[in-house]
Amino acid sequence: MRKEKDCSRKKGKLIQLAILCAAILFTCTACGDKPTLKERVLSVFEEQKDMIRQKIADSDAEDKVEWDDLEGVIYINPGYINPDVVIQFECVAEGILTASIQAGFYYSPDDEPAIVGWAWNMGELVEEGDGYSCSDGTDNYYYTERICENFYYYQESN
């Protein structure tokens, strides 16, 4: 009888150990493969950059052509093509209210970094790393970095 109890305990511990190992393995694989915000945005841009550039090149300041749906883009501002203004393409929006982050890319007609989205009133951009950033002294933060000619990555958080 005692031998059966010991065997039963060992089986129970082995099952618990197997469940624990499976949970650890699942957690490691679920967290390890997720691309960064920047990688996600750059992937969307790379897949559609030729089409976006062509639409901008084919338009003029009088055009009010609506953008077709772009894969991976959730918001475009302004919603029409105008080669003379900054055009924002938001690809990621996570979180809620004061704990949110947005990221995307934008077209800059003069190939200069710009502030897009809600961060427009946070002040001047200053050099940081490979790009530029600004903050209003709170947890609101904006970062932008050149992708290629006339296109920049941006990330804003609050």
List where the protein language model places each region.
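Extracytoplasmic electrostatic interaction patches
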Residues: 75-158
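General secretory precursor processing signal
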Residues: 10, 31-34, 137
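Residues in intrinsically disordered, low-complexity segments of regulatory proteins
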Residues: 6, 66, 117-119
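Intrinsically disordered regions, especially transient/low-confidence alpha-helical propensity segments
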Residues: 28, 64, 115-117
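Sec-dependent bacterial lipoprotein signal peptides
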Residues: 1-29
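A general, composition-driven signal for non-globular sequence regions
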Residues: 3-10, 42, 103, 140
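N-terminal export/targeting and maturation segments
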Residues: 31-96
